[in-house]
Amino acid sequence: MLGSWRAFSEMFCHLRPWRRFCLRKVLPPWLHYSRALSGAEAINALRPFYFAVHPDFFGQHPREREVNENSLKRLSVYLENLQKPGFKSLKPTQLTFYIREKTAQNSSEGQEPVSTTGFRAVRFTLHSSDLLSTVLYILNSCSLPVEHVQSLNTNVHSQPLKEATGMPDRPIKWHRSYYSFTGFKDPDEDLEHVSRVETTLTSWLGSNGKGAVKKLKNSLPLRKELDRLKNELSELLQLSDIRWQRGWGVAHRCSQLHSLSRLAQQNLEPLQNAKGCTIVFTDRSGMSALGHVMLGTMDVHHHWTRLFESLPNYFDLQRRMSALEDQISHLLGGIQVVYIEELQPALTLDEYYSLLDTFYNQLQRSRAPPRPQSLSGLQMILSRYAPSLHELGHFNIPALSDPASLQSFMRTKAQQARENMRRREKLKVIENELIQASTRKFSLEKLYKEPSISSRQMVDCCKRLLEQSLPYLHGMHLCVSHFYSVMQDGDLCIPWNWKKGEAMK
């Protein structure tokens, strides 16, 4: 029996190089070295995927809609766990999605042929502990483009991606006949093509401007309805704000507000507990680390009602969390513990409190003498990675770290941190001025940016925009992102580092 098993394993050992090639195929050459991806950047990078599988587009196909809803929930949990500080390992997660397609394509490994209904099933298993590798694996599994992810890997210290994938240092080169026979794309040929023909802002707006205007005009009645519903609910429940975690379309947002409005008509009393709060429509219900009330878009009214009824308990936990932050601040010389939504994983209040409690207990056990107000005015966030000073001026501190060396590191970098914070404030003022100037010059209805776009990137983008003459932008909604896209409601997305002039020949 043992001999049979050995023979069986030897039979397939020659496939190991093929596995390494598959990893190379999934990860483009420009990502051989890359940095850690933030949660906001991951969501942004996966936008083409979310658009292809969103349940709203499967209204006439309830079975496929349900499959996508359940898979999106599991994917959301996987991605959030991947970003949590101190995580050790994740169980492999098998997911099935139905992908919308306009035209039929040949089936490939792991995919079923396109059905007559205009979608196909895709199955894949997530097992990577690296967020960037996971994002690329999802996009490639669904035959979606990955080129827009390249711009997410600039201006940051790189780390070898091979650690997450087990890839060899030496890239595997295949003869052109291999690509001709298999039908795979030659990455070197694609790279050469991109270098020859590069999209410019003017050419892209010229090709997509009219279509965006049409979509925007069609969405105007729903946009007015959205504003009306938002104002009515904010006034009725005395809310601070209503927001959305993801880039859902206007119709989807209206549907969510109608649902909340019906719940308020049926049972107003529990909802009044949210007075003064910000409501965020997201993937799961609860309270966020920032204290926002999260309404899961896949949950039914019963779940929402239970959440509103339990808000007093959450408010109590908020008070305990604030006290815990003050205690940590005292032990670390007056530094302020903050949660920055754009730079940290999406944590619930319970998860964030548990993280703070773990960090506090570690400080307590070290018995390191507190240094009163030596770090007053500075900020820190809890993260997964080694201690570092962010360009915005805050410290990134791992939840599990040696308190003595931690304090020494922060004292050494304190002066640099203060200088970074002063630069950040000046940069923010410049950014706001440039946004206003750009909005006026191009008569934009709205100019905004993705959460993953830094102030420095936004400033660079707006400065260059102000040097251009772009009549296509009149009356439009313009979003500064990492790639070109026309959203379903007519918003124009452009990369912050857009190219000007004629396309390169």
Swiss-Prot record:
Q: What induces it?
A: Up-regulated during induction and maintenance of graft acceptance and down-regulated during graft rejection.
List the taxonomic lineage: Eukaryota, Metazoa, Chordata, Craniata, Vertebrata
Q: Which UniProt keywords apply?
A: Coiled coil, Mitochondrion
Respond yes or no to whether keyword Coiled coil is given for this record.
yes
What protein name is recorded for this chain? T-cell activation inhibitor, mitochondrial
Task: Report, as the record phrases it, the tissue specificity of this protein.
Answer: Expressed in peripheral blood leukocytes, mainly in T-lymphocytes.
Give start-end ranges for the coiled-coil region(s).
216-243
Q: What is its main location?
A: mitochondrion
InterPro entries in alphabetical order: DUF4460, DUF4461, TCAIM
Q: Where in the cell is it found?
A: Mitochondrion
Function comment = May regulate T-cell apoptosis.
GO cellular component terms?
Answer: mitochondrion
